[in-house]
């Protein structure tokens, strides 16, 4: 790193520390979602034309005067009815606390990370341990940041966010792509519009489905793109055959979407017909994983009884099986039906995590941390039952393997060694000790449920601002800690 780069980096961090430290030398305070954010007029005015005009237009903010970025003027908005902000504090409306801090972080330092904290529980992302690189939570945060940067006139941040969205939509769900498509149309972001419209055109969704999510003129343009693409493919057909792969992939995607709609409506018979008549591969289409996450126990049971799905099939880069997902959901019904159909409680993900590891970690979180954010939806009794089911299944498998090993040894050694009685076998194998340990865990979990208050008390606004900044300032985490540290960062 050159001396110039080092100097600029140091300058950026120095300014960012002013924001992180909150009240140090602060001369303006904002109220966002009931939380105070301390800042510095000179920095905001120097970095944003909006704030420059805002501060020039009001020498001393009145209690009911606020900033509303949905008002397109660059002066203080009209008084906010019902505002309860104390004198000297400027209420900010229509922008969330997290997005406002990201905006200020960029204004102070020129740098920002517009993604949620890795593995952080988010209300619009149901996957435990998600890295939030292209899920709905990541897309929504980027869209909110883009809107705020446009409203406050921070064009550099808007360009940075557009680039990030362009990379996100390549892997995002089609629903999220359509959200970005609508936003790019409203804000005249032509490159992002082009990227998203082509992705939607290739999705294979029929016009009647698109019309439920998109304006009719947008649907018309999508259909025009499809027509042009179809003509282009036909013109290349004598010379190219790679389009066959694309067509086959489109057909496979459509097949998977039909399968999921059938599962959503509990129509397992239709799925059976697709397997028999259309060659649908339930494993590659992750049918069982989807059913465990989104459907009822009866649907999962019926799907397993078709005999066409591998109950231990690993999915995605992490290699999670349906039992891993059921353990993360803390669903005794799903755990039980999967174990009934020979799901392996000892199967490991790519990171070496078993379903039992997941449940033990969740139990530990309850015992030692209390009801922390991300675990509040989990019922302790269900967690205890899931742990008991998976642990019992693991012990049964262990005993069967031990018996098979003993039988093999007995066949190989005809009477040379005396047989050990069952009591001695079970004691020496550690089975009773494991059972005792598991009972202690159950007792502790049950006893702890009465004390599961908040994980920590609310700090003051100064500490809250420091924590809010830290969530997006420290973003590196060891993937091996996916299950043991995913509840560290919360407000």
Swiss-Prot record:
- Composition bias (Low complexity) maps to 403-413
Record keywords: ANK repeat, Cytoplasm, Metal-binding, Nucleus, Repeat, Ubl conjugation pathway, Zinc, Zinc-finger
Locate the coiled-coil region(s) and give their ranges: none
Effect of disrupting the coding gene: Defects in inflorescence and flower development. Bop1 and bop2 double mutant displays leafy petioles, loss of floral organ abscission, and asymmetric flowers subtended by a bract.
Tell me the compartments it is located in: Cytoplasm; Nucleus
Which residues lie within the region annotated Disordered?
400-491
- This one is known as Regulatory protein NPR5
Lineage of producing organism: Eukaryota, Viridiplantae, Streptophyta, Embryophyta, Tracheophyta
Gene this protein is translated from: NPR5
């Amino acid at each position: 790193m050159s001396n110039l780069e080092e100097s600029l980096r140091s300058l950026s961090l120095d300014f960012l520390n002013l924001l992180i430290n909150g009240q140090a030398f602060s001369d303006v305070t904002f109220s966002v979602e009931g939380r105070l954010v301390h800042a510095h007029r000179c920095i905001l005015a120097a970095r944003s034309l909006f704030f420059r005009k805002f501060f020039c237009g009001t020498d001393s903010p009145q209690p009911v005067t606020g900033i509303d970025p949905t008002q397109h003027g660059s002066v203080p908005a009209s008084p906010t009815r019902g505002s309860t902000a104390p004198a000297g504090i400027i209420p900010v409306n229509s922008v969330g606390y997290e997005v406002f801090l990201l905006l200020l972080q960029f204004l102070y330092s020129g740098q920002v990370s517009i993604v949620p904290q890795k593995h952080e529980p988010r209300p619009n992302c149901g996957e435990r341990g998600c890295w939030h690189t292209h899920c709905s939570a990541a897309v929504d945060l980027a869209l909110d940041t883009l809107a705020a940067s446009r409203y406050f006139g921070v064009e550099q941040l808007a360009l940075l966010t557009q680039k990030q969205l362009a990379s996100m939509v390549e892997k995002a769900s089609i629903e999220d792509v359509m959200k970005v498509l609508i936003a790019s149309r409203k804000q005249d972001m032509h490159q992002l519009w082009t990227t998203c419209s082509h992705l939607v055109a290739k999705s294979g969704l029929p016009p009647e489905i698109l019309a439920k999510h998109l304006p009719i003129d947008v649907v018309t343009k999508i259909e025009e793109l499809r027509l042009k693409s179809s003509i282009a493919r036909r013109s290349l057909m004598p010379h190219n055959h790679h389009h066959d792969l694309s067509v086959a992939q489109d057909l496979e995607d459509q097949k998977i979407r039909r399968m999921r709609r059938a599962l959503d409506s509990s129509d397992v018979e239709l799925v059976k017909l697709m397997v028999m008549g259309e060659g649908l591969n339930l494993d590659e289409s992750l049918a069982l994983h989807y059913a465990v996450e989104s459907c009822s126990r009866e649907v999962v049971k019926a799907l397993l009884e078709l005999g066409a799905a591998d109950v231990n099939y690993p999915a995605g880069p992490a290699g999670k099986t349906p039992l891993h997902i059921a353990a993360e959901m803390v669903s005794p019904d799903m755990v039980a039906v999967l174990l009934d159909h020979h799901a392996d409680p000892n199967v490991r993900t790519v990171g070496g995590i078993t379903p039992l590891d997941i449940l033990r970690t969740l139990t530990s979180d309850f015992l030692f941390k209390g009801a922390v954010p991300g675990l509040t939806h989990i019922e302790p009794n269900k967690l205890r039952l899931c742990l008991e089911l998976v642990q019992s299944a693991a012990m049964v498998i262990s005993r069967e393997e031990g018996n098979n090993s003993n039988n093999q040894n007995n066949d190989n050694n005809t009477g040379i060694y005396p047989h050990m009685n069952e009591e001695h076998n079970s004691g020496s194998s550690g089975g009773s000790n494991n059972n005792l340990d598991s009972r202690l865990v159950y007792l502790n979990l049950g006893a702890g449920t009465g004390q599961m208050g908040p994980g920590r008390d609310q700090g003051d606004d100064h500490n809250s601002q420091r924590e809010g900044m830290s969530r997006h300032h420290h973003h590196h985490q060891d993937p091996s800690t996916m299950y043991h540290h995913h509840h560290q960062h919360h407000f």
